[in-house]
Design a protein with these regions (language model features):
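Charged, flexible cofactor/metal-binding loops and thiol motifs
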Residues: 1-72, 86, 90, 146, ...
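Conserved ABC transporter NBD signature motif
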Residues: 136-147, 201-204, 210-218, 228-230
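Conserved ABC ATPase "signature" region
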Residues: 269-286
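A short, proline-enriched helix->beta-strand linker immediately N-terminal to the Walker B motif
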Residues: 310-314, 330
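A short, surface-exposed alpha-helical micro-motif characterized by mixed small hydrophobic
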Residues: 358-360
Length: 453
């Protein structure tokens, strides 16, 4: 893909250089627009590392190569999903998902658990691009399929504010020095130094703004030009089997709708595929001509599963697929999903609030609380060595089948204000043992290590 030359900040990127970057970047341009700024003559070999850091071209390429060459199918990095309400002084911000990162490996079932309102469903919807994410990136097969630019825009805003403040401080400093100067030569030197400092401040701010604008253009390009084939390989099973199906459409129309959107208009072939999907999920051909209200909750969920599977997905996001079903039906749906996973080689993200279900269905589990991942580990490790107080609280809520044990079961109440002191030492997601991550600060990390011993 060809590129136009770009003027930006400290660099004069000629067409030859940009073509090299384009070749290395595998066809993901950072844009054709440019800012009119003062050019400084720098040699390509001397400034190549600066260009990497400035535009994030090769780090992104490196990450893509790492993902393609590994078994990581989906990679979520620093995902933030905020919702805004009101306007002006009454504008409020809801942090549904706050800076989470995780990988999903090929063939595994990755569980996301937590109480209602913790952000697990929003995470799934953000991955599948039902929401425009606020900040962060989602990589699928090494390609960035979704990204947010709010942080970049805030950085531009704060850079402009810092520039004004710094120039104001320089001006006040100049006035003070001029008042103390005794000769015209000293005043001339003070004014020259002031102009030089102001120029440096503006140049530095201009470079930062140029960098962030380039990243914003890259994000817009990635969001707009994501290959449709990649997006189609990610499908979702929604939580409510009633509201997720159009009551005015027949089952056949519901299931084949995705095929028609993608340009498959051969009714005979589509009907054949619909029948195959119905049989896969335990329904029969006669059900294709019926409407959703004629089915039970479990059958409606099977229709939702068939609708997702007909697109031949590689990654299936299951958003609490059994929470709205009767207990007698839940086991059937879980067994069906497990069989489909084995038969079709699916990778799954299983969202639930019931740890007892996730334990037997998922390979790894991420526990979410108030938009953050507080613990992430394999299923066996999480149930054997739960460390975070919130994880312990969730596990203590699992009912016991033995009535005698159930009577004596001790519930653990999680109170963040009592369990943590983050006033000075701020927390982050840290690896305490291989594959086991905890959201904690330094002091808590040491305590958790002692607890494991």
């Amino acid at each position: 893909m060809s590129r136009n030359s770009r003027k930006s900040g400290d660099f004069n990127l000629d067409e030859e250089l940009m073509s090299k970057i384009a070749a290395n970047e595998a066809g993901q341009p950072i844009g054709d627009e440019h800012e009119d700024q003062k050019e400084l003559e720098m040699e390509f070999n001397e400034q190549f590392s600066l260009i990497e850091n400035k535009y994030g071209i090769h780090p992104q390429l490196k990450r893509r190569e790492e993902l393609i060459n590994s078994d990581v199918l989906l990679s979520v990095r620093n995902l933030k999903q905020f919702f805004f309400f009101g306007s002006g002084l009454n504008k409020t911000k809801l942090k549904a998902v706050s800076n989470i990162s995780f990988d999903v490996h090929k063939g595994e079932c990755f569980g996301i658990v937590g109480e209602s309102g913790c952000g697990k469903t929003t995470t799934g919807r953000s991955i599948i691009k039902l929401y425009d994410i606020t900040s962060g990136s989602v990589y699928y097969k090494g390609y960035r399929i979704s990204a947010g630019d709010r942080w970049n825009r805030k950085e531009i805003k704060f850079t402009k504010i810092r520039e004004v403040r710094q120039i104001k401080e320089l001006r006040e400093k100049r006035e003070l020095l001029l008042a103390q100067a005794t000769t015209d030569a000293q005043k001339t030197e003070i004014n020259a130094q002031y102009e030089y400092d102001v120029l440096n401040v503006k140049k530095h701010s201009s470079n930062i703004i140029s960098t962030q604008k380039a990243k914003i253009r890259q994000i817009k390009f990635d969001n707009k030009h994501t290959p449709r084939k990649l997006v189609n390989e990610i499908q979702m099973i929604f939580q409510d089997p009633v509201d997720s199906l159009d009551p005015r459409m027949t089952v056949e129309d519901i299931i084949q709708e995705g095929l028609q959107i993608q340009g498959y208009h051969n009714r005979a072939e589509n009907h054949k595929k619909v029948v195959e999907m119905l049989e896969k999920v335990g329904l029969v051909e006669e059900h294709a001509s019926r409407y959703p209200h004629e089915f039970s909750g479990g059958q409606r969920q099977r229709i939702g599963i068939a609708r997702a599977l007909i697109m031949n997905p590689q990654l299936l996001i299951c958003d609490e697929p059994i929470s709205a079903l009767d207990v007698s039906i839940r086991a059937q749906i879980i067994n069906l999903l497990n069989d489909l996973k084995e038969d079709l080689g699916l990778t799954m993200i299983f969202i639930a609030h019931d740890l007892s279900v996730v334990k037997y269905f998922c390979d790894r589990i991420a526990v979410m609380y108030f938009g953050k991942i507080v613990e992430l580990a394999t299923s066996d490790e999480l149930f054997k060595n739960p460390l975070h107080p919130y994880t312990k609280s969730l596990l203590s809520a699992i009912p016991k089948p033995d009535p005698l044990i159930e009577k004596t079961r001790q519930r653990i109440i999680y109170d963040p204000s009592r369990a943590h002191d983050y006033s000075v030492d701020k927390p982050s997601l840290r690896e305490i043992t291989p594959g086991h991550f905890i959201y904690c600060n330094d002091q808590e990390l040491e305590n958790y290590k002692k607890e494991l011993k």
